[in-house]
């Protein structure tokens, strides 16, 4: 059987027009621009309008990625949508995206891996392409997180923003594409970042709403330590598997959770700040959308050129984490 190499053929991203600045948050919660910036690096985040929903941004990002890949929606045979903020419980957001795109030949599903969702999707799509089960896979990270934050809790409401990013994967020439990909999870840390309401365990009632059970809960100090360790370790693992070191990496795109986390991971990997991409100041934490948005911004700006080695690492609720290294 002929060996198939899988790589990214096209990228895209989309986010709401609405912007929520630190100054806006100062008026609704006990915080300040200085407090937010010094602890997170965030200056503003995108916020969806009440009549906007996750799949709209996913579809816009997907259309960009498909066009840049030089294919048609009908050529897509696999859609993986990473999200923790779906349009609705049933059907999956992936199926809604499929219908809107007209990608009627595709299998579609959602991935619930929080901030690691996009790298989970890349890893699964890479495997499907390599084994011949898919020719063109669409991987999307899309979120409207601002609907799930408690605007009386300054530890969480300042962090999250909305948006979507997408990538089309397909066969590429030998020596290019995804060189190594790994994903991990550890459910023992479930309560470091979670939302207890809305499921069959926590339920959905006037009481759960009054308690704020549908909002994100986070234990920031504990999460920081596990996130830094896990992202650094899995970055080293994928580099070793690919026969590379950090000196080979042209660009490092970590999940945009918090600037302090990004800086700490970069320090552990001993990589220069000039090769670390950060857009958290303008977008905040967009969970599964953060890496694909960052990736597309780097493609659009010319930060990534053919032959460049790009390293991506993520960490999210679950807890989950992942690492992917590729040659563009």
Set out the residue ranges of the language-model regions.
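Beta-strand segments within the central parallel beta-sheet cores of soluble alpha/beta enzyme folds
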Residues: 36, 75-82, 109-112, 135-142, ...
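A contiguous, well-structured pocket-lining segment that forms one wall/lid of small-molecule binding clefts
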Residues: 209-280
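Flexible, glycine-rich active-site loops centered on histidine and acidic residues
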Residues: 130-164
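Conserved catalytic cysteine-centered active-site region
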Residues: 35-56, 84-137, 267-295
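Catalytic phosphate/nucleotide-handling subdomain of diverse soluble enzymes
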Residues: 293-313, 319-328
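Acidic, glycine-rich active-site loops and adjacent beta-strand->loop/helix elements
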Residues: 14, 82-87, 113-118, 141-146, ...
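Conserved beta-ketoacyl condensing-enzyme motif
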Residues: 8-10, 50-109, 119, 241-268
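Condensing-enzyme catalytic core mediating Claisen C-C bond formation in acyl metabolism
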Residues: 1-50, 153-225, 229, 233, ...
């Amino acid at each position: 059987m002929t060996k198939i190499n899988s790589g990214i053929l096209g990228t895209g991203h989309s986010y709401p027009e609405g912007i929520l600045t630190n100054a806006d948050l100062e008026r609704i919660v006990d915080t300040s621009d200085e407090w937010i910036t010094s602890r997170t690096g965030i200056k503003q985040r995108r916020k969806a309008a009440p009549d906007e929903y996750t799949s709209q941004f996913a579809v816009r990002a997907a259309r960009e990625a498909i066009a840049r890949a030089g294919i048609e929606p009908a050529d897509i045979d696999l859609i993986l949508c990473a999200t923790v903020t779906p349009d609705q419980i049933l059907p999956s957001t992936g199926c809604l995206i499929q219908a809107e795109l007209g990608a009627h030949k595709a299998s579609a599903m959602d991935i619930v891996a929080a901030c690691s969702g996009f790298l989970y999707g890349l890893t699964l799509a890479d495997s499907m392409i390599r084994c011949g089960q898919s020719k063109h896979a669409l991987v999307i990270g899309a979120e409207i997180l601002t609907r799930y934050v408690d605007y009386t809790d300054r530890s969480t409401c300042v962090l999250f923003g909305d948006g979507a990013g997408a990538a089309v994967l397909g066969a590429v020439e030998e020596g290019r594409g995804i060189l190594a990909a790994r994903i991990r999870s550890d459910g023992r840390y479930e309560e470091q970042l979670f939302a207890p309401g809305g499921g069959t365990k926590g339920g959905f009632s006037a009481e759960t709403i009054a308690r704020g059970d549908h909002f994100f809960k986070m234990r920031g100090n504990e999460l920081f330590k596990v996130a830094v360790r896990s992202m650094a370790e899995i970055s080293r693992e994928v580099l070793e598997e690919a026969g590379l070191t950090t000196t080979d990496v042209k660009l490092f795109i970590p999940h945009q959770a918090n600037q302090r986390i990004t800086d700490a991971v970069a320090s552990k990997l001993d990589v220069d700040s000039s090769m670390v991409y950060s857009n958290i100041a303008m977008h905040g934490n967009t969970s599964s959308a953060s890496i694909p948005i960052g990736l597309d911004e780097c493609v659009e700006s010319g930060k990534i050129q053919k032959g460049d080695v790009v390293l991506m690492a993520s960490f999210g609720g679950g807890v989950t984490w992942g690492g992917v290294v590729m040659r563009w």
